[in-house]
Amino acid sequence: MKYKAHDYQQYATDFIIEHPVSCLILDMGLGKTVITLTALWLLLFDYFEVRRILVIAPKRVAETTWPAEIKKWEHLYGMTFAVAMGTAGQRKEALLSGADVTIIGRDNVSWMTKNIFFDFDMVVIDELSSFKSPKAQRFKDLKKVRPMAKRVVGLTGTPGNLMDLWAEIGILDMGQRLGRYIGGYRDRFFLPDKRNREIVFSYKPREGAEEKIYELISDISISMKAVDYLDMPECISNRVTVSMSESEQALYDRMADEMILEYGEGQDIDAVNAAALSNKLQQMANGAAYDESGNVRNIHDRKLDALEDLIESANGKPLLVAYWFKHDRERILKRFPARNINTKKDIEDWNEGKIPVALIHPASAGHGLNLQEGGSTIVWFSLTWSLELYQQLNARLYRQGQKHMVIIEHLVTDGTVDEDILRAIEKKDTTQNAMIEAVKARIGGMTDDGRSNDEGI
């Protein structure tokens, strides 16, 4: 795919190239990965500034996002990569492979520093919040080898806690800007907040502390304020692809082929026609499905895992999560401290920024529902065939009065009906006929009532 950079993306890429130490403090969904990869390619093959690059990321991001982005963009052709995941032997093989870019999960940083000679002249830390605790072992171990890299890039969203910035910036510049000790940073920029006599439970920033902190790190960082003056798009639509395991995909494919999954009497998952099959396949793509008795059968947690990554990347910035099936909502609520948007009080709390993760059903997001003050990011956990409901929900945030760029994230399970739905939405063809035709195309030869066109002998 050809990459056409927005102004802010080109600005950020140039910033990385021009600054040996750099930090991109940009909201989730703005393309920090491709921004960084573009800079890495240029530093490797145009400027010959670096020869081996280490990318540290959360496990699932390391396994899927970075490799997928490298393979996705045409302008990154020629860049080799290795993913240091799996067994100790597999990780070691990847780290010693000599690839241009080696990607490792943050949980393996300590293992790497103890078992492999550190031979990287550039480090990229995707999600700096992974290193917000100076007491964490991964922070201490990376700090030891950090001076061996002549270039470093940190990627993060807008911080929800200024106290965390000390460690996050410190791992990049080795304490040059915010000081070498957390105590000095705390005394300089914070005051005790909640306390019990001599025991301080929390701190609050001093007046003007935020402006002063950002001023101190301004020479190495790009924040949302720094790119505000550029020609920023009003809305960005992203696809977050997840993949099922072979066994999970086999269940999905069997349902598509046979229209039934047998679990025992009263527990089967079945479909009687193309429309019902599309519904069941969509449920399975989301991770669970109702059996014939109305009970929920879990298939996988791939979208929940991806949502967890998005929540972490948001750094406390509110997310509005759209779901379609009741079991989607229940599974999300079981895993995350989310809250439904149902009542007037829910709407008020959302608009006041009191709900970090809010759940909403597209059918309940009618015209006149104002949610734009509470956030600017929508995550479609479940997609919908209804173009009207899709546009209607997006318009709850992407509307007059919205002060920030709107990010729309779509969770799409690879090789499933999710891809058909998103394609139909993009083409604005989400009729009942389009849904049935999509199912027919996937499984071949089905009529509307579920019978096969292939009558046989």
Predicted regions and their residues:
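Conserved RecA-like P-loop NTPase helicase motor core
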Residues: G105, R329, P337-A424, K428
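Conserved Helicase C-terminal RecA-like lobe
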Residues: M1, E18-V21, L30-G31, I35-F45, ...
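Non-catalytic, charged low-complexity extensions flanking SF2 helicase motor domains
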Residues: M405-I407, L411-I457
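Conserved helix-turn-beta segment of the N-terminal RecA-like "Helicase ATP-binding" lobe
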Residues: V61-G86, L172-G175
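Conserved helix/coil segment N-terminal to the catalytic DExD/H
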Residues: A88-F120
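Conserved P-loop NTPase motor "coupling/switch" region that bridges the ATPase
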Residues: R52, G78, S97, M122, ...
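Conserved Walker A/P-loop ATP-binding site and its immediately adjacent core
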Residues: I35, V50-K72, G160-D164, F325
